């Protein structure tokens, strides 16, 4: 069977069929919009609201022909941390990019590009990036896309370069010099903005995407590709295209890549920032409202153009398209004397909040998946999922083991409607805001100035607007309040560049009857060859043993095999505990859901250490180990103020007794 293109208009991804069905690996395209609100899309809200509506017929058709993920969440209500979590598969409790850390280099570790590259994919990033690090050129940017697994990059690198959508043109009405001036566009190691006169970036990224899809389908039909297409609209500046959308769509119409300086695309003509979609003129809207609506309908045309291209190339039935947004709707215009308010079109739908807020309006993003014969059509799911689930999903499509370090789960069962969906960990963190889902309820605290601050608790299935705070309303919700406070400490690791008031809190143990435990270490062995330490718990064990300690002495392990140690640690006293580990192979060590030690990507055998504050009691752990040596060895040690550095003793290691 020929490969499948998974075009991700960042929303939901492919289907349960992927791994067993594909003789060749599917192509993957992920398309992410910038600041598009849940309520900005017709099928989700606009078509039902009163007054002038934003029209998105192509997106509407895409959504109803596929699966709508009605409760899909970004990890933070602003772009940089959201995009970092998307790329790395880590939520905001583990990501190295948090809060307002624009332009911070994304960590050098496994991500959705370099994992797929290991599976033979040609990897492409188009559009907005913003995770490159400091400097002025690719040789200085530590986190440049081609240094993070992308074979080809064409787009804007720095955060501010995505705020003006005519990179080669001065924009006189911008409200400051940054929003007026020209911007850089990079193609791999070459800055190319001088040839982009009158190129509106929404059109530019789309034309390049079409060109690459057509060229690779024609010239490299046996090599799968992954395309991450990240638009920089409808984020401000609220600029207009030059012309109406070109007639037609697909390979015989729509946007076209011409490739000539000054005439790079077929809409690079006329006057910049001039075309208002006539469906919004003479309707009593303000100039800024016309601009905002036009920018969204332009994206809609682009989606339809790309989908038609897939159909024209006869790869639509071998393609999955995902659509989504990085966070909720914005409040900026970047125009002299003008302001924008997302309430004009109710861009958050009926939800409370917008960009920058961890209420639903800032975090619940429009997301859906489309793929004839692949994605379950006409499905609307209310199961919760989040950005970090996409990397796991992509690995599943490519037939790869899911890296143990990441926080996500594969969404294939949801997208196909077949099989049991693993529960996603939903966690939010941004400045002093923090939240999670637990037992189906959303807990959110907007000003977590200390860990004692209570969560507001909402049932977002029945109360999307978050109008009824359930916290303290019954004994059940009082218990849930405590559990939420405990759980957020078990999910995340502190980041020294994004400090929180709760960083130094003791991580609580779990409530479990010690009489139901016995000394030992659960030890599962796995056969296989993996580029990284995989999530062994989702694989079938070749053998299961009960060991006394965390060692591989006398374990019948062969080169390139794996081991999962699991059980419970009995921590003898509360305080700071440092864990040290050194190995001939690669390993991942987790306590609760906390990623404590990560010695997988580029690990070279040195001892690594991490300190965390643990309360006295019982804490679940998992140690994932992948052997890469003919003489394997691993040593996990701990120490505290009262306990000298030593191997964790057997009397501190427990497993559950078999049920009689």
Regions of interest found by a model, annotated:
Residues 24-29, 65-70, 117-124, 148-151, ...:
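Loop/turn elements at helix/coil->beta-strand transitions in domains of secreted/extracellular proteins
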Residues 35-53, 142, 159-388, 395-409, ...:
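Active-site-proximal cap/lid insertion segments
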Residues 8-18:
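Bacterial N-terminal signal peptides
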Residues 497-578, 582-660:
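Extracellular/secretory pathway-exposed regions associated with glycan biology
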Residues 45-48, 66-90, 102-103, 125-138, ...:
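Short, solvent-exposed turn/loop segments enriched in Gly/Ser/Thr/Pro and often Arg
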Residues 19-23:
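Sec/Tat signal peptide C-region and signal peptidase I cleavage site
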Residues 69-71, 376-382, 399-409, 420-426, ...:
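Acidic/polar loop patches that form or flank catalytic/metal-binding clefts of enzymes
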Residues 30-31, 37-125, 134-137, 148, ...:
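Active-site segment of extracytoplasmic enzymes that catalyze sulfate/phosphate-ester chemistry
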